[in-house]
Regions:
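Iron-sulfur-associated redox domains of electron-transfer enzymes in respiratory
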Residues: 49, 60-193
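Gly-rich Lys/Arg/Thr-decorated short loops/hinges at beta-loop-alpha junctions or inter-strand turns
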Residues: 1-3, 29, 107-113
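Catalytic cores of glycan-processing enzymes that make or break glycosidic bonds
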Residues: 7
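Iron-sulfur cluster-binding cysteine motifs and their immediate structural context
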Residues: 1, 17-43, 47-66, 70
């Protein structure tokens, strides 16, 4: 489908992070001592993507630039919408939520909340979460799939881990309370209020 990971040989430092984090055992070490990402077996979860310090993994579905662009565009659109705080609501848009219901529920009620859909929160890095603050939001709410509802193995684990990493960094600035992670099933959107 072209949505999975692609190894960018010229950027790879052979750190083996992709091997460590992939729940599907897609990356392997070849006899020549190189990494091989078996594209035909990749599930497209994106867990390896933010784990690569050299950006040596290309991603067909949604890459770093696209994630940051979605975030920046949504924040720019929301600026000036109201005088109150702006909260970026980053949610899994892969299949956990009915976006129509989420938008309808928020319409008029929460003018300072902006929706940014990402196909699985595991694709986010701590830097992506921190960049939202750099772009001017007052807070970030990450909404992920509840345990065992994620389309991908370990998706909720890696999403939570990256939120925790960003919160640790924000704590040094006394801003940890501005980033929250919640798990809400598509059936439980009334919890969002």
């Amino acid at each position: 489908c072209g949505a999975g990971a692609e190894w960018l040989r010229d950027k790879c430092a052979l750190c083996l992070n992709c091997l460590r984090v992939c729940p599907y055992d897609v990356p392997v070490i070849t006899e020549a001592g190189r990494i091989d990402i078996r594209v035909d077996q990749c599930q497209g979860c994106g867990i390896c993507f933010p784990a690569c310090p050299c950006k040596a993994i290309g991603f067909g579905m949604l890459g770093v630039t696209e994630i940051q662009s979605r975030l920046k565009d949504a924040i720019d659109e929301a600026k000036g919408r109201n005088g109150g705080p702006t909260i970026a609501v980053i949610y899994c848009d892969f299949d956990a939520y009915d976006i129509t219901n989420l938008r309808r529920m928020m319409k008029g009620k929460h003018p300072g909340k902006l929706l940014v859909g990402i196909p699985c929160l595991a694709k986010l890095s701590a830097i992506d979460l921190l960049r939202a603050f750099e772009y001017g939001v007052d807070g970030v709410l990450a909404i992920g799939c509840p345990n065992n509802e994620c389309t991908y193995q370990e998706g909720e684990y890696w999403g939570q881990r990256r939120v925790d990493e960003a919160k640790r960094l924000l704590a040094e600035l006394e801003m940890a309370d501005r980033l929250e992670m919640h798990y809400i099933s598509g059936l439980d959107l009334d919890q969002f209020d």
